[in-house]
Amino acid sequence: MMEQKCIGKVTATESKPTTCTSVYFWLSPDVIIRPFDLVRIEHISGDGSGKSYSYAIVRELSYITDSAGHLANYVSSDFGDITAQPMNERLGTTIAEADVLGNNRNIEMPIRDGARVEWAGPDEIRDALGVANLQQPIPGGYIQTSNKEEIRIDFEARYLVGPEAAHMNISGISGLASKTSYAMFLLSALQQRMPNDVSIILFNVKGPDLLAIDQPSTSLSDAQKDEWHKCGLDPEPLENVTYLYPYAKRQERCFTSSHAPKDVIEAQIQQDRAFNYYYDVETFKGGEAGNETDVGRDKMSLLFSDIDDPQSTMESCIQELGDIQAETWDKLREEIRAKTAKGQAGPKEIPVQSWRKFSRLIRTRTTHDVFSSLWPGEGRRQKLVVDAIKELRPGKILVVDIAPLPDYLQCLVFGDVIRTVFDAKLDLYESINREDLGRVVVFADELNKYAPSSTGSRDRTLTRWLLEVTERGRSLGVVLFGAEQFRSGIHSRVLGNCSTDVFGRTNPVELSKAADYKLFS
């Protein structure tokens, strides 16, 4: 192994010895280094022949002098004279504290005092980080060290999208953390490297941010394009994208309530890539038990995910909907309202008061235009969510716009998509072949809205479904990529099942709440 320039030597003292996992070293005065730089350190070989190398990542830097205290420095400056020049400079050096990552001969003994410290080379850094010999590398970015080396960092696909491990979480404050930007970079990497294996579903949760991802960016500078090339990727827009917008009775807006510019939607319609999703009664209320539409009754509970229901009375009402004969939402609301007068007889009796509460909620929460019937005419371009998922294939992307919807409808649509994909992977839909979907990656921002850390004594329906996805989805091929501002606001089991965590810029309040940030302290 080629010998590099020596930049310092290990120091082990009585009060701060080296250990199996940590090491201290002083630096040559002309060396510039920073936290997260990687170095290699000479170590014993184990068999007495030659030497081995340990690799460490710098965690903290400190400068120490022979001064007994700050007051001594004050006195040495002629008792506080800021213009005084010292006769002799104090003896001092920079001390680096580093965490040991490993050894090229698997030596786990503490590093000896006086051991030579050198810059680690690019190949050594990749090997120390465990990304040197990946079976299917997915570019995750690159790092630049203080000695101007640039090293590409990859993920192993088997641990990012399964089947060995799966799910990713991105956290950081709004705007500055670039959560969505990094997620889009990673999804582009998946599409470029695994076009025959991975399909993608995105949720647009704010403004028109993700409603033109198949269009080239006009703001991408040459320097940014070079950064893509350093990662081994082409700085190109995503391909094979279909957009689902919330249906609305607004012909002048292409029958949608989306915030996307009208000219953008019209261009997508011309290319047959834009549709308006809606919910009809039959699909939503469910059919007979055992029918594939029976899951609709489960999804209806998402409408009330923010309503306290300790006695599960609303769930009981929902389960009775399959017996109601109704072809339109008006008819369904009318049939439910009829039950508020007489209730139900028999062993499954539901109190009239419960039906009245349920009727009131159904009436107020199904007035949005998205609750509709299929209208004739191509101009409306209506499509059920399940039909859009049936058409999903590896290499394709489905963008679902939920930004203009109120929170309870956002939870409904998000949960509907998650449950439909999960059930399709369980072969609960006769019309969907689970192998045709490939491995489905679902990306959602503001994950804390759907899986909050505190939901009372009982997790709500959507949270339970997300827990099922993160706990069982890896083996089925359903992968969740989530992002949020505050990691501490996410359900602990959802976080615990994520094999990959990405940390963006955050604030001191979040640092004090989320235990995971102790890794960086």
Regions found by a protein language model. Give the residues of each.
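Conserved ATP-driven motor cores of ASCE-family P-loop NTPases powering translocation/secretion/packaging/pilus
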Residues: 464-521
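Basic- and hydrophobic-enriched, low-structure N-terminal and domain-boundary segments
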Residues: 1-173, 186, 193-197, 436-438
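Conserved catalytic network of the ASCE P-loop NTPase/AAA+ motor domain
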Residues: 161-162, 192-196, 235-237, 391-392, ...
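Glycine-rich phosphate-binding loop of nucleotide-binding enzymes
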Residues: 143-242, 492
